[in-house]
Curated annotation (Swiss-Prot):
Pfam family, one: Pkinase
Family statement drawn from the similarity comment of this UniProt entry: Belongs to the protein kinase superfamily. STE Ser/Thr protein kinase family. MAP kinase kinase subfamily.
EC number: 2.7.12.2
Gene name, Swiss-Prot/TrEMBL: map2k1
The protein, known as: Dual specificity mitogen-activated protein kinase kinase 1
């Protein structure tokens, strides 16, 4: 069915003319924003939601530490802690990420300045941004609160995420990455399940992408992790591009499909435990069993893997030097397997790009499928479903 021409987005200028986090809210700004939003080919529901978010945001004004009240902790990681907070002047619920950094004022100001680009990132596939400020040794990044949490939290509850649900996730991630690249010349740099957020309306959005080079540099030493979603070319320190984000998406999809970080790959015994039936190993991957490792390694995955876990340096060596992970045959559709294989090609020049992935048969099939993403998420996470969930035909 051809898309009908979207109605123009209606945004009311802020009546008091106050600045939103230091940005003037003149009519000219609103007209420019309206024009940008009209280029996005949104459906009616997406348009209304973006419009509602931006109208709410106009009421917020300048963000200050005193205006927030903590509701609960949402999670920690990526060098910071995220809280669910109430913005007292407007009663809006937000997610506030606090990043503690020992840095000079000039660097701090540069980070806040660079984060202002987030004000222009308005897409149904990108988490909404209210503003960023500095207070008491911490940078605060205030975002839209997504009540379903991140996909790593959903995965822990669900055990495994069904292929049809992952089809909707794939569409949203590709559209989010395409938006960042085409409209803002931004790479994400950190695609993984914990940076894909979902809500009870059935929306799927990317967060924590690399808009601030200075923030990335300032946090470079804060990586403490037992798993890596980085592409082989990035781990080797060679030039990397948005192709690196595609590897990370592919690895994340395999993890969510099998229920555990996929390196080293599960053996036949573990696959049987995961899927409750005998699973065919891909004939080509029969020799891919990881080299035996000494016991007592720090944990690097969860799931019923009886083998000793890998140390982080072994894991990184495995990503660079061993064949990429695959979805096991006989459990997943051929299109899904092929889609993941095209994301997980070690040579970035041979890896599928965003345009190719968007027209892949797995995506085309997923766009046509009626999937109640909101219903599945709400029953998995014990959430109350709102009255107007997103009808995720094409997300």
């Amino acid at each position: 069915m051809p898309k009908k021409k979207p109605t123009p987005i209606q945004l009311n200028p802020n009546p008091e003319g106050t600045a939103v986090n230091g940005t003037p809210t003149a009519e000219t700004n609103l007209e420019a924003l309206q024009k940008k939003l009209e280029e996005l080919e949104l459906d009616e529901q997406q348009r209304k939601r973006l419009e509602a978010f931006l109208t709410q945001k106009q009421k917020v004004g300048e963000l200050k530490d005193d205006d927030f009240e903590k509701v609960s902790e949402l999670g920690a990681g990526n060098g910071g802690v995220v809280f669910k907070v109430s913005h007292k002047p407007t009663s809006l619920i937000m997610a506030r990420k606090l990043i503690h950094l020992e840095i000079k004022p000039a660097i701090r100001n540069q980070i806040i300045r660079e984060l202002q680009v987030l004000h222009e990132c308005n897409s149904p596939y990108i988490v909404g941004f209210y503003g960023a400020f500095y207070s008491d040794g911490e940078i605060s990044i205030c975002m839209e609160h997504m009540d379903g949490g991140s996909l790593d939290q959903v995965l822990k509850k669900a055990g495994k995420i069904p292929e049809k649900i992952l089809g909707k996730v794939s569409i949203a991630v590709i559209k989010g990455l395409t938006y960042l690249r085409e409209k803002h010349k931004i790479m994400h740099r950190d695609v993984k399940p914990s940076n894909i957020l979902v809500n009870s309306r059935g929306e799927i959005k990317l967060c924590d992408f690399g808009v601030s080079g200075q923030l990335i540099d300032s946090m470079a030493n804060s990586f403490v992790g037992t798993r890596s979603y980085m592409s082989p070319e990035r781990l080797q320190g060679t030039h990397y591009s948005v192709q690196s984000d595609i590897w990370s998406m592919g690895l994340s999809l395999v993890e969510m499909a099998i229920g555990r970080y996929p390196i080293p790959p599960p053996d036949a015994k573990e696959l049987e435990l995961i899927f409750g039936c005998s699973v065919e190993r891909d004939p080509a991957s029969s020799e891919l069993a990881p080299r035996p490792r000494p016991p007592g390694r720090p944990i690097s995955s969860y799931g019923p893997d009886s083998r000793p876990p890998m140390a982080i340096f072994e894991l990184l060596d495995y990503i660079v030097n061993e064949p990429p992970p695959k979805l096991p045959s006989g459990v997943f559709g051929a299109e899904f397997q092929d889609f993941v294989n095209k994301c997980l090609v070690k040579n970035p020049a041979e890896r599928a790009d965003l345009k190719q992935l968007m027209v892949h048969s797995f995506i085309k099939q997923s766009e046509l499928e009626e999937v109640d993403f909101a219903g599945w998420l709400c029953s998995t996470m014990g959430l109350k479903q709102p009255s107007t969930p997103t009808h995720a035909a094409g997300v």
